[in-house]
């Protein structure tokens, strides 16, 4: 199946949240590893389906940010994603506390528990509103980047379409392309600065709400860094 043929349907958020809650309850009530494993596979299937719909909306919105249908879908996902993250966090906690943890680790490896512990440090219901605001700002940034229409040598190009000219063998042409791109960024400097400033303050607030000194520690956790730390990076 081609990507363009993959069906998209906005999920019923309340129904999906209830499905996750039911799976979590069943998982906690499991009396054997076989029973817990069966619920685990159900949760994986549901999670993959929901994530597929989210990714379809995101990619198709990126392909054409002027598409009003997927623009509306991104508005939905910007609000829905933090709520679904709360469901995932509850599931991760159930996995971490499971009496069958050793059985899961024996079959699937311990990495998923390492990642679950990291994810648990990166989330709290206290930052749900900030997460939704962050998603909207990131969407706004993507729209701004996609809106670029840069005049160059009689044509009009997007940022990606201008890239070949920036790598042209001719020095003068390369320089002109870089200057054309720079002029566009300069023209929209206030918009970029506004998004950046809001994100910095928003993420700093998120980090502090979770008990960290700022965003850096939270940022490492959110990126799922499981094999090196901020201290390791500072050595370089």
Where in this protein do the model-derived segments appear?
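Alpha-helical coupling/stalk and coiled-coil linker elements that connect catalytic or binding modules
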Residues: 232-236
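A well-structured
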Residues: 1-231
């Amino acid at each position: 199946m081609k990507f363009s043929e993959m069906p998209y349907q906005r999920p019923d958020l309340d129904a999906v949240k209830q499905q996750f809650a039911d799976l979590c309850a069943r998982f906690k009530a499991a009396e054997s590893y076989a029973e817990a494993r069966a619920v685990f596979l159900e949760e994986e299937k549901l999670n993959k389906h929901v994530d597929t719909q989210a990714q379809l909306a995101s990619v198709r919105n990126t392909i054409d940010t002027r598409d009003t249908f997927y623009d509306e879908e991104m508005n939905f996902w910007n609000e829905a994603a933090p709520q679904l993250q709360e469901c995932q966090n509850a599931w991760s906690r159930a996995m971490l506390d499971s009496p069958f943890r050793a059985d899961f680790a024996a079959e699937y490896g311990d990495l998923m528990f390492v990642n679950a512990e990291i994810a648990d440090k990166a989330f709290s219901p206290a930052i749900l509103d900030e997460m939704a605001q962050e998603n909207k700002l990131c969407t706004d940034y993507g729209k701004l980047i996609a809106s670029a229409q840069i005049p160059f040598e009689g044509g009009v190009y997007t940022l990606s379409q201008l890239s070949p000219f920036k790598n042209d063998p001719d020095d003068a042409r390369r320089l002109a392309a870089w200057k054309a791109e720079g002029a566009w960024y300069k023209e929209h400097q206030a918009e970029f600065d506004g998004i950046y400033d809001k994100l910095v303050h928003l993420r700093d607030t998120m980090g502090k709400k979770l008990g960290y000194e700022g965003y850096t520690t939270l940022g490492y956790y959110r990126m799922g860094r499981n094999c090196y730390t901020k201290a390791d990076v500072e050595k370089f």
